[in-house]
């Protein structure tokens, strides 16, 4: 049973939450669970931005199939190679053999180390500031090494000012049906989970995180779409999560 939600008319949220997990990365307690977020842009070309953990893969593929309809999947952008976002990559390529994998040089090094399937003629390598058009949407890519893995990058969609921020600006905590922070009392419900996530996941890479914040400051951002936690879309909410 599909559970997709619209971020915009042709941008879909395909993520799911795991409330059964006790320790995130076998290290950090998550008493309120955790969400694994993935996004799909349906345009002249279809673009999937990141994937999900194996634990929620069934729901993910149901959501993806429903959102695509009869369309093929043209691109999958990998902002972060950690297994909770790429464990489903091999199955994705099996289901959609014509898909092109978009990433940077380190992304493809990691894919070759993590998987055994052949990615020959299936890749599009991007560098700092490179762009990709899906038709009505233009994406730019910015490297964010060691936030918190060496291959990390973020993706900025120009027309609707959307930052797909990888693990940056995320939080612990499962989502309860709503996907936007402003659908919650976020100043009450999310501060502890946001701070705990930041301090445990990306905060220890202070200089690298500050470098990403400087890049983000130069972008006009209307939406922050992280890989964990709610989507931030109001100016007050975006300022709040960046400040936290």
What are these regions (language model features)?
Residues 5-9, 103-226, 231-234:
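Metallo-beta-lactamase
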Residues 24-29, 52-54, 78-80, 139-145, ...:
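Short, flexible loop segments at the rims of nucleotide/cofactor-binding pockets, characterized by
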Residues 118-122, 182, 242-243:
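Short, hinge-like loop/turn segments at secondary-structure boundaries
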Residues 49-51, 73-81, 101-104, 163-166, ...:
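Active-site neighborhood of phospho(di)ester-bond hydrolases with catalytic His/Asp-centered motifs
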Residues 44, 55-102:
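Active-site metal-binding motif and surrounding structural segment of the metallo-beta-lactamase
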Residues 4-65, 154-157, 161-165:
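Conserved beta-strand hairpin/beta-sheet module of binuclear metal-dependent hydrolase folds
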Residues 235-244:
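Long, charged amphipathic helices and adjacent flexible linkers at domain junctions
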